[in-house]
């Protein structure tokens, strides 16, 4: 087997994109989970250079999974479903492609609670000002899971509201360019 990417660590809940450097054709694709991990992944897709999703003809791997947490969840389009093994060592899953293909892009989303910036969803950022929440405006989420606002007050207390479907909110500040949750 050929290792085409190693995930060093994940600090953000969002979709991640990998562009493999190897340009050959693959017949099999596999994700090998680190030890002490159950292979928790919500979504995992492979694409060719034309940006078509590569179709699988057979799933393979560790199927000693928790109920409703099988490999079919990896490409069901539901960010809340996920693969979850009973095992913690040597956990892997993959598939045989319908035909050998170049893999131009891999997109994956770790297991999450869907509490991150989502593409196409509307958000509104507020800051606390003398006893009331003031709006800094509405923005639409992008694939990179980044919202950019101008004229944001320094040393303020913020709250981001997902206007599309949000009900859980936490306040936060920025310190040295990093978001601090309270």
Regions found by a protein language model. Give the residues of each.
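Non-cytosolic beta-sandwich-type ligand-binding/adhesion modules
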Residues: 1-7, 109-145
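Disordered, acidic Ser/Thr/Pro-rich linker "stalks" and the adjacent N-terminal cap
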Residues: 1-25, 36-103, 111-118, 163-182
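Ser/Thr- and Asn-enriched, surface-exposed coil loops between beta-strands
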Residues: 12, 25-27, 89, 141-145, ...
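Residue-level detector of beta-strand structural context in well-folded domains
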Residues: 18, 93, 123, 145-147
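Noncatalytic modules at the cell exterior or secretory-pathway interfaces
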Residues: 21-34, 150-164
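A broad, low-specificity signal marking well-ordered, structured residues that form hydrophobic/aromatic
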Residues: 29, 93-95, 123, 158
């Amino acid at each position: 087997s050929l290792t085409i990417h190693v995930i060093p660590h994940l600090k953000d809940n969002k979709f991640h994109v990998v562009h493999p450097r190897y340009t050959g054709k693959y017949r099999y694709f596999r994700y090998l989970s680190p030890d002490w991990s159950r292979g928790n992944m919500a979504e995992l897709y492979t694409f060719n250079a034309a940006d078509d999703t590569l179709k699988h003809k057979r799933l393979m791997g560790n199927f000693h999974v928790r109920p409703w947490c099988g490999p079919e969840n990896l490409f069901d389009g539901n960010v809340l479903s996920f693969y979850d093994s009973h095992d913690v060592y040597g956990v892997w899953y993959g598939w045989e492609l319908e035909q050998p293909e170049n893999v131009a892009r891999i997109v994956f989303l770790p297991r999450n609670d869907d509490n991150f910036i989502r593409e196409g969803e509307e958000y509104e950022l507020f800051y606390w000002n003398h006893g009331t929440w003031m709006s800094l405006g509405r923005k639409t989420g992008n694939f990179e899971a980044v919202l950019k606002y101008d004229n944001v007050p320094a040393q303020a207390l913020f709250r981001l509201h997902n206007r599309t479907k949000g009900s859980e909110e936490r306040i936060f500040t920025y310190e040295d360019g990093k978001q601090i949750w309270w």
